[in-house]
A protein has these predicted regions:
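Histidine-rich, glycine-flanked metal-binding segment
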Residues: 7, 35-36
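Immediate flanking context of iron-sulfur cluster ligation sites
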Residues: 42-54
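A short, polar/charged loop-to-alpha-helix boundary motif
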Residues: 17-31, 35
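Short beta-strand scaffold segments in enzyme catalytic cores
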Residues: 1-8
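Residues embedded in well-ordered beta-strands within globular domains across many folds
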Residues: 2, 49-51, 73
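Zinc-dependent deaminase
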Residues: 59-128
Length: 128
């Protein structure tokens, strides 16, 4: 995950560290927002854009709402736990005090293939 400022400056990057850190909240999106918050000295990430490979889960989606992220761009949809339009859409829910502009499916086939091959490699299987 990469979080950028309105000017295009990279403010934070993140990778899934939940297993390594024994932290169920250490998803790539959360790690990128934590880094950006430290860089800005603020928990609000107003007008920033978050780029991720896979559609965020509910936890990450709500963290993005609380951080006031302006835009989300993701590659592959997540038909099991996607919370930004696939299974449900937390970031556009009018009951929240902030909504996020979403652009999903950007290079979606490539993102899906890369994710599949990553997990296949972890299981000792050849790439697709």
């Amino acid at each position: 995950a990469v979080l950028v400022s309105p000017a295009g400056e990279v403010l934070g990057e993140g990778w899934n560290r939940n297993i390594l850190d024994h932290d169920p909240s250490a998803h790539a999106e959360i790690m990128a927002m934590r880094a950006a918050g430290r860089a800005l000295g603020n928990h609000r990430l107003v007008d920033c854009t978050l780029y991720v490979t896979l559609e965020p889960c509910a936890m990450c989606a709500m963290a993005m709402v609380h951080a006031r992220i302006a835009r989300l761009v993701f590659g592959a949809t997540d038909p099991k736990t996607g919370a930004c339009g696939s299974v449900f859409d937390l970031v556009a829910d009018p009951r929240h005090n902030h909504r996020i502009e979403v652009r999903g499916g950007v290079l979606g086939d490539e993102a899906s293939r890369r994710l599949s091959n990553y997990f296949r490699a972890k299981r000792g299987k050849p790439p697709l």
